[in-house]
Amino acid sequence: MILISVQELQKSFGVHEVLRSVTFSLQKGEKMGLVGVNGCGKTTLMRIIAGEMQPDGGTIHRNKDLRVGYLAQLDDIPLTDTVWGALLKVFEPIRVMERRMAEIEKLLESADPETALRLSSEYQRLTESYNAQQGYAYEGEILRVLNGLGLKPEMHQRQVSTLSGGERTRLSLAKLLLQKPDIILMDEPTNHLDLEAIEWLQDYLTDYKGSLLLISHDRYFLDHVCTTMGELLGGKMIKFTGNYTEYMKKRTADFETRMKAYELQQKEIQREQAIIERYRRFNREKSIKAAESREKRLAKVERLEKPVEEQHVRFSFDARRRSGEEALEVRELSKSFEGQPVFQNLSFKLRTGDRVALIGPNGVGKSTLFRILTHQINPDHGSVRFGTNIDIGYYDQHQQNLNPQNTILDEVWNAFPKLEQTRIRSAL
């Protein structure tokens, strides 16, 4: 059963055309990954489907009474709510039944026979509806989702206003999952999730009975969750059956097939044009008519678009000068915030050329360690020693070291004032 059908969708921002002719459908139970280069219109398409943005052209047909849930960057959860209270609101219809059932139980204690019969009948109807909606299980479901997303019991009574941006995003995700819409729209849901929470979410979405439209740069997440893939390329949608790995194999084969068809058509067009040109050079009535006939036939041929191959970014990190064999030594490093230890007695060494991934659940101190290594904060105890001729490059996930008032060119140029502008532009 088709839940959403998109036909010839178009969207531009000024003179920049983002979506040119997007056509696809989403079936019941289908879990579709949406991929494409940055700026190709993935989030724009998702916002249009969610009803947050209007297209310039085309149509979207949704099944009647279709419930669509959209995980955007921000949610409308009141800041004065507690974490637990915000999620209880998802089950407000069930809680209304609970309150009415409790009220009936009290009324039955002093009701006359006629009233008792009426109240008992209402109580039975409520009980049947309550059980059908698994009203007895909703608090356990809230706990399961909160714990799965890394929002531990000690956070459940905290006000939303005290949560970090990442914690609020996880709370919004928890609310969306508990609402159980027919279609879930997710834009980068693994942001702000640690590995354990990502694995939990993978399993949850794999077992989810509804449909899913997902934007993610995490190919392993896409592999685990998705049953189809949709690629936005040149303002259009190309859809593939299978997960991300299968999509990449089919995409390569599809690109080669389309390129071969395009090249064959171009070759045939050039051959026809050469014949037309030769006929015209004869400059005879018969040959001119033959040329005009071929021109008309050629004009009716539907031209194939040249397939566009996705450009890949390639980074090269070259040291500015030769360093010593030992790059970094950390000894007995400890750090606490407001009396709460983040890590204690941390020791390790890095040698020149080592490549180390720093992993762990949220809150264990990964970013804190980086801030100590880059001299943004001081440790409580321990020492950090860098080797000879070591320069540090630091990429902050929140880009707090960028000046929002600068242009992109000026921001880089201010950091490297001696570089030529052409070299900076080439890097950008």
Feature map (PLM): residue ranges:
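C-terminal boundary and immediately downstream tail of ABC-type ATPase nucleotide-binding domains
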Residues: 251-284, 298-306
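ABC transporter TMD-NBD coupling linker
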Residues: 294-312, 355
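Heptad-repeat amphipathic alpha-helical coiled-coil interaction surface used
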Residues: 101, 108, 123, 130, ...
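ABC ATP-binding cassette signature C-motif
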Residues: 1-262, 311, 317-428
